[in-house]
Design a protein with these regions (language model features):
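Alpha-helical packing segments of well-folded alpha/beta enzyme cores
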Residues: 13, 17, 37-40, 111, ...
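Short catalytic helix/loop segments, enriched in acidic residues and glycine
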Residues: 3-19
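Acidic, low-complexity terminal tails and accessory targeting/binding regions
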Residues: 61-75, 79, 129, 133-144, ...
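Short, conserved phosphate/pyrophosphate- and ester-handling motifs at nucleotide-, phospho-/glycolipid
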Residues: 150
């Protein structure tokens, strides 16, 4: 970011967000180390007299690649032109999107695995252990966890929890600043949980 903080409008949005979040029973807050995320969470923490755990892996997913439409510098891996990314069928597949030559050159999968591995470590501490494409419920609970992060990173987390290619999310959804995405765990059979998204952006 050019300015790693909030604009005047951004501070107003963070205030509105705090009015929404202070009505919830929140177990833990987790926040990116970047100034924008920390400033966005600050009104909520102040009103609730709480603190947030800062996680380096929640910073924006700013791994740089050689994107086809930008020839003079490396750039973030989303916001491709539709005519470029939609031609590679691998981008639509949860287990093949990273095989594109441009992604391989920047080890996108390695960075992706680091972030999603950290997410799984955190979820395991809250009783949910990754098991294939689902989660083994070690300790069933209704804890609400709140993450203050960034669009590109959010799509990485969602792609892992929902087993979707991040390319589809990076190019198919749009999240406004200070917006809220909600996921719930669903345990249709005892001991096995899956994540379902009930609201985005």
């Amino acid at each position: 970011y050019t300015i790693d903080s909030l604009t005047e409008k951004g501070w107003r949005e963070a205030e509105f967000l705090s009015e929404r979040l202070t009505k919830l029973e929140i177990r833990d807050f987790y926040v990116s180390p970047l100034g924008r995320a920390k400033d966005t969470v600050s009104p909520t923490l102040k009103k609730m007299n709480r603190t947030a755990t800062e996680c380096d892996w929640l910073r924006e997913f700013d791994v740089l690649i050689d994107r086809p439409d930008v020839t003079d510098k490396k750039i973030i891996p989303w916001d491709w032109l539709p005519q470029d990314w939609t031609r590679d069928e691998r981008f639509y597949q949860y287990d093949h999107w990273f095989e594109n030559e441009r992604m391989l050159a920047s080890d996108l999968k390695g960075h992706y695995d680091y972030v999603t591995g950290k997410l799984d470590e955190l979820l395991a501490k809250h009783g949910y252990v990754r098991d294939g494409h689902c989660y083994k419920v070690v300790e069933s609970n209704e804890d609400t966890l709140v993450f203050f992060c960034h669009f590109g990173l959010e799509c990485v987390l969602l792609s892992h929890l929902l087993n979707i290619s991040p390319m589809v999310l990076w190019h198919g959804v749009c999240a406004a600043p200070s917006s809220v995405t909600t996921l719930n765990t669903e345990e249709r059979r005892e001991g096995i949980a899956a994540f379902r998204m009930s609201a985005f952006g």
